[in-house]
Amino acid sequence: MSENTRKVTVAVIGSGNIGTDLMIKVIRHSDVLQMGAMVGIDPDSDGLARARRLGVPTTAVGVHGLLELPNFDEIDVVFDATSAKAHAANAALLEPLGKRLIDLTPAALGPFVVPAVNLDEHRHAANVNMVTCGGQATIPIVAAVSRVTPVAYAEIVASIASKSAGPGTRANIDEFTETTSHAIETVGGARRGKAIIVLNPADPPLIMRDTVLCLISARDPATHDAIRNSIQAMVEHVATYVPGYRLKQQVQITPVPDGQPVHTLLASGDTAAPTHQVSVFLEVEGAAHYLPAYAGNLDIMTSAAVRYAESVADTIAAPAATQGATR
């Protein structure tokens, strides 16, 4: 960001775990973004209390309160960390007013963005969707495999600490699986995708763990090596904005046993039987900016959202000198 470009002013709707972590990331770690408002519906929420202590304008009456804030016109980008249902209503109010929306719910009204895979494809979109925590963790791996060889079927299992799943996450379980499955195909490149989420009740809580299984038709050892290299490169890429993202163990590529009914998993019309399964085991440790380190599932969502917002800042923030000349 050049010295002549102003910072991008953002608002966060949702004063729960995700929204509060977003605010902390913007205030403490972004040279490009600045907080303009924190929006909630519970005046006693910790997120709103923290925002007030940090000098961030707040409202406890939802998006309508955001519209009434004196600095509303200065806000460029709105992060929505509410719920899929609430996002539809929020978007209907904010999009006509020219606000760029970054949706952290499974609503999926706009195109999917997974920064490690398609960061530059939707730079001017009015509303983008950050898929889900499981999608942000696993879709890069599916994409890494599909860049080397076609993926007939990809299945992901995201295991998150039950304590990290707030009411919004729990209310959106069905939307989580549907949205993630769709994004595995459209962003990850799999012919067919499936997503499963597990709320792990272990105490003390365990960090986020993800399993990615891809069915491929590739017998050549050189192709297998290329897949491993592609996955390793992708893990390193994601770790540039989510430092706690890592492989739990070595990538496994094993033959599909004879007689295994994998044809039941294939997309309609696909007849070629996959020859091998790629198995990838990941863990995501949170940065603990606001949330505990075990909440890597939430940290990867907020980190991805901030990464996207920073990457498109140049499409939003006009040079300060130009602004002054046009007033």
UniProtKB/Swiss-Prot annotation:
E.C. designation(s): 1.2.1.10
Catalytic reactions of this protein: acetaldehyde + NAD(+) + CoA = acetyl-CoA + NADH + H(+)
Active site (record annotation): 133 (acyl-thioester intermediate)
InterPro entries, alphabetized: Acetaldehyde_dehydrogenase (IPR003361), Acetylaldehyde_DH_C (IPR015426), NAD(P)-bd_dom_sf (IPR036291), Semialdehyde_DH_NAD-bd (IPR000534)
Record has NAD as a keyword: yes
GO biological process: catabolic process
Binding-site residues for NAD(+), renumbered to this chain: 15-18, 164-172, 297
Disulphide bond pairs: none
Keywords: Aromatic hydrocarbons catabolism, NAD, Oxidoreductase, Plasmid
GO molecular function, one term: acetaldehyde dehydrogenase (acetylating) activity
SMART domains per record: Semialdhyde_dh
Top EC class for this record: oxidoreductase
Family label: Belongs to the acetaldehyde dehydrogenase family.
Protein name, entry field: Acetaldehyde dehydrogenase 6
Organism for this UniProt entry: Rhodococcus opacus (strain B4)
